Amino acid sequence: MEFLVEDLGLVPYGEAWAYQKRVHREVVAGNRPPTLLLLEHPRVITLGRKATGENLLFPESWYRENGFELYWVERGGDVTYHGPGQLVGYPIFPVGREVRRFLRQIEEAIVRVAAGYGISAYPTPGYAGVWVGEDKLCAIGVAVKEGVSFHGFALNVNTDLNDFTVIVPCGLKGKGVTSLEKLLGRKVPMEEAKARVVAAFAEVFGLRPVEGSVHEA
């Protein structure tokens, strides 16, 4: 079997969210194969199902006035940040009732990507995502509707980590964030990171990647 890979480039969050829903409907209907959307977002704060707003360090209006979009969404988890230099992946895959297994597979794929750079990263029991020590390298939060996933992961490649300081990331006080750039001491080409993520997903899910159609607004 195969999965479709669509590289969308830099896409505003609201536009990408709407496109996810469209792709989700097509996968549910059986009109397209499992699909992995890869993209970056302009600066945006998103709040998931567990969020109450207490982990926002400023009023919602402050974020919008200071160059951040802000969205309340249906993914799992609390509050997180997306921005340029961060590789966001939305795997829109049939998962049925195997949601925990699906989350573990995403984690394993990211662990393999990190290992390819010589980084020992791992899941931490009780916390979503992939970690290096006390710092989160990759956030994970999904939603499942009609047996098909959407939302996904956010891997810090060359992310400006200072932008995380305006929230309590994932609601985890005392935990930090990191990036491939910080860990390696150099910029990582985004196209290289994308290729490694696609290869890791192919290995973990046992699917063959096929380049998808060009995204149109």
Swiss-Prot record:
Pathway assignment: Protein modification; protein lipoylation via endogenous pathway; protein N(6)-(lipoyl)lysine from octanoyl-[acyl-carrier-protein]: step 1/2
Domain (BPL/LPL catalytic): residue spans on this chain: 30-209
GO MF entries: lipoyl(octanoyl) transferase activity
CDD domains: LipB
Family: Belongs to the LipB family.
Gene Ontology cellular component terms for the protein in this record: cytoplasm
GO aspect biological process, one term: protein modification process
UniProt enzyme class: transferase
Record's protein name: Octanoyltransferase
Active site: 170
Positions with a binding annotation for substrate: 75-82, 139-141, 152-154
Catalytic activity annotation: octanoyl-[ACP] + L-lysyl-[protein] = N(6)-octanoyl-L-lysyl-[protein] + holo-[ACP] + H(+)
Gene: lipB
Main location: cytoplasm
Lowers pKa of active site Cys, annotated site positions: 136
PROSITE patterns on file: BPL_LPL_CATALYTIC, LIPB
Naturally occurring in which organism (per UniProt): Thermus thermophilus (strain ATCC 27634 / DSM 579 / HB8)
Other facts: In the reaction, the free carboxyl group of octanoic acid is attached via an amide linkage to the epsilon-amino group of a specific lysine residue of lipoyl domains of lipoate-dependent enzymes.
Disulfide linkage: none
Superkingdom assignment: Bacteria
The EC number(s) this enzyme carries: 2.3.1.181
